[in-house]
């Protein structure tokens, strides 16, 4: 066997030429202890706060506590297969999620992984979950209405695009139902061609039963609303870090639309459960507890989340992100820690009360305690004209009703006021999944505030409303179209509307 020296030297030269000198360096640490969804890791000296780390079995976690000799990591998954002594490696990336139009119509977990069995998500880009909210200069004051389709809200507590309006109440008072109706009401706008009228919806379910989330998705699907919605679900069986992260992930998905000159609505259902999950994580990380055992930065947790809802100025694309956070109270106690925090952060609140709910007033909005700090800036001119009166009349009615309990001999004016108030209260009731368009609400409220219901028994108000709407939809579509396109109630429209309502009221028996 002969050895060719030239050939060997050529092979060696080729090998040397193709030799790659890039060695991949990954910083790894070791698990010191693990339990209750928290791992203590030694050796990750350069890890960043909020950075994703990966355990041996592929489960991911987030570095939250950076201490002198170890790192406190919260685990996004089960900690059963993580053992003491296992290696943990840095990923070099702060926690991020996929964002873009590809997520519409899908159900994802807090990390943006699909959980609806419809295959992988074709996302456009990834975005960090916890980013800084827009400053003062890029913002613009809220001035466009965000119609919910609920008379009680659109007339009395108007919500604008870019606003944060809290929905607060005890369990089983219809908080989710209000948010669901607001999502369903965007269907006609999203099916139209006007891009500026479209409103994409993100629903974040935190700590809810899986059956509840499945039911919610089913209702959206049946009503054709899933195609413009994203569902982010961190259910009751998910680890606390996932429940803590879900609202931030949903917010990042909503911000994609806001920053690309589109409009989005995000519902956090609910932030009390997120605060409880954050409290659990903080106590397990040995952070000092404060009031009600919540950590000291629980206010900052919610404020940095809700400040990201904004209306941007024209130079920044004029997009918007509207937030409807939900808070569940215990026995109507709105002076507890989390409710007071979120009330002070948001631009108004919708109070839902158990008593009203059981009296059959649904949506069970307490009009006296509810407020929108944006006010009529978020209403169309047409709605302003008819709804201005209803606020005053209902306020007087509530005042008089309190006194009327004590005396039976009331003068005619007071009796008239009480009769009008009870009929207006009846008029503001609305069945679920039946949102009304703005122009239809204007017609109904016009009839109420101008005394056309006063002669009717209260039990007949609903029938009157249904009949009037059916008449206007079938025979007077042009009037509805005029109000819709002009967003105003001109003198001519008012005269036409008056004639229609008068004729209908005479014939209604």
Curated annotation (Swiss-Prot):
ATP binds at residues 169-176. F-type ATPases have 2 components, CF(1) - the catalytic core - and CF(0) - the membrane proton channel. CF(1) has five subunits: alpha(3), beta(3), gamma(1), delta(1), epsilon(1). CF(0) has three main subunits: a(1), b(2) and c(9-12). The alpha and beta chains form an alternating ring which encloses part of the gamma chain. CF(1) is attached to CF(0) by a central stalk formed by the gamma and epsilon chains, while a peripheral stalk is formed by the delta and b chains. Keywords: ATP synthesis, ATP-binding, Cell inner membrane, Cell membrane, CF(1), Hydrogen ion transport, Ion transport, Membrane, Nucleotide-binding, Translocase, Transport. Produces ATP from ADP in the presence of a proton gradient across the membrane. The alpha chain is a regulatory subunit. GO terms for cellular component: plasma membrane; proton-transporting ATP synthase complex. InterPro entries: ATP_synth_asu-like_sf (IPR023366), ATP_synth_asu_C (IPR000793), ATP_synth_asu_C_sf (IPR038376), ATP_synth_F1_a_nt-bd_dom (IPR033732), ATP_synth_F1_asu (IPR005294), ATPase_a/bsu_AS (IPR020003), ATPase_F1/V1/A1_a/bsu_N (IPR004100), ATPase_F1/V1/A1_a/bsu_N_sf (IPR036121). Its EC number is 7.1.2.2. Pfam families: ATP-synt_ab, ATP-synt_ab_C, ATP-synt_ab_N. Belongs to the ATPase alpha/beta chains family. It is found in: Cell inner membrane. It catalyses: ATP + H2O + 4 H(+)(in) = ADP + phosphate + 5 H(+)(out). It is a peripheral membrane protein. It comes from Methylocella silvestris (strain DSM 15510 / CIP 108128 / LMG 27833 / NCIMB 13906 / BL2). This is ATP synthase subunit alpha. Transmembrane segments: none annotated. It is an enzyme of class 7 (translocase). The record marks 370 as: Required for activity. Gene3D superfamilies: 2.40.30.20, ATP synthase alpha/beta chain, C-terminal domain (1.20.150.20), P-loop containing nucleotide triphosphate hydrolases (3.40.50.300). Its main location: membrane. GO terms for molecular function: ADP binding; ATP binding; proton-transporting ATP synthase activity, rotational mechanism. PANTHER family: ATP SYNTHASE SUBUNIT ALPHA, MITOCHONDRIAL (PTHR48082:SF2).
């Amino acid at each position: 066997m002969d050895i060719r020296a030239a050939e060997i030297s050529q092979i060696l030269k080729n090998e040397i030429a193709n030799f790659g000198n890039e060695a991949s360096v990954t910083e790894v640490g070791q698990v010191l202890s693990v339990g209750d969804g928290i791992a203590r890791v030694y050796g990750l000296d350069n890890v960043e706060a909020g950075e994703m780390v990966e355990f041996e079995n592929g489960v991911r976690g987030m570095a939250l506590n950076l201490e002198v000799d170890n790192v406190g990591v919260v685990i996004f998954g089960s900690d059963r297969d993580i053992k003491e002594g296992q290696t943990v490696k840095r990923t070099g990336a702060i926690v991020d999620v996929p964002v873009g139009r590809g997520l519409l119509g899908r159900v994802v977990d807090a990390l943006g992984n699909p959980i609806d069995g419809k295959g992988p998500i074709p996302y456009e880009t990834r975005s960090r979950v916890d980013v800084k909210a827009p400053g003062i200069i890029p913002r613009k004051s809220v001035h466009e209405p965000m119609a919910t389709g609920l008379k009680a809200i659109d007339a009395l507590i108007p919500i604008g695009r870019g606003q944060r309006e809290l929905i607060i109440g005890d369990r089983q008072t219809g908080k989710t139902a209000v948010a669901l109706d607001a999502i369903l009401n965007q269907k006609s706008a999203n099916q139209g061609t006007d891009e500026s009228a479209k409103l994409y919806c993100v629903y974040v379910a935190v700590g809810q039963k899986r059956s509840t989330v499945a039911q919610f998705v089913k209702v959206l699907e049946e009503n054709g609303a899933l195609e413009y919605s994203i569902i982010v679900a961190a259910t009751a069986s998910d680890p606390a870090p996932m429940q803590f992260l879900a609202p931030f992930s949903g917010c990042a998905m909503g911000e994609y639309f806001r920053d690309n000159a589109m409009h989005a609505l995000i519902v956090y259902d609910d932030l009390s459960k997120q605060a409880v999950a954050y409290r659990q994580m903080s106590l397990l990380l040995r952070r000092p507890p404060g009031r009600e055992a919540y950590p000291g930065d629980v206010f900052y947790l919610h404020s940095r989340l809700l400040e990201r809802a904004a209306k941007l100025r024209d130079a920044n694309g004029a997009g918007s992100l509207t937030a409807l956070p939900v808070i569940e109270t215990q026995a109507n106690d709105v002076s507890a820690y989390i409710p007071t925090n979120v009330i002070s952060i948001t631009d108004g609140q919708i109070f839902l009360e158990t008593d009203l709910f059981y009296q059959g007033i649904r949506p069970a909005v307490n009009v006296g305690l509810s407020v929108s700090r944006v006010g009529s800036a978020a209403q169309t001119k047409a709605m302003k004209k008819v709804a201005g009166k209803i606020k005053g009349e209902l306020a007087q009615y509530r005042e008089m009703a309190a006194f009327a309990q004590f005396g039976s001999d009331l003068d005619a004016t007071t009796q008239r006021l009480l009769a009008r108030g009870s009929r207006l209260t009846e008029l503001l009731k609305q069945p679920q999944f039946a949102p009304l368009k703005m122009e239809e609400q204007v017609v109904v409220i016009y009839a109420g505030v101008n005394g056309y219901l006063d002669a009717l028994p209260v039990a007949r108000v609903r029938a009157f409303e249904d009949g009037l709407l059916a008449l206007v939809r079938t025979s007077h579509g042009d009037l509805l179209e005029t109000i819709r396109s002009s967003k105003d109630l001109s003198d001519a429209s008012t005269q036409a509307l008056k004639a229609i309502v008068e004729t209908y009221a005479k014939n209604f028996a």
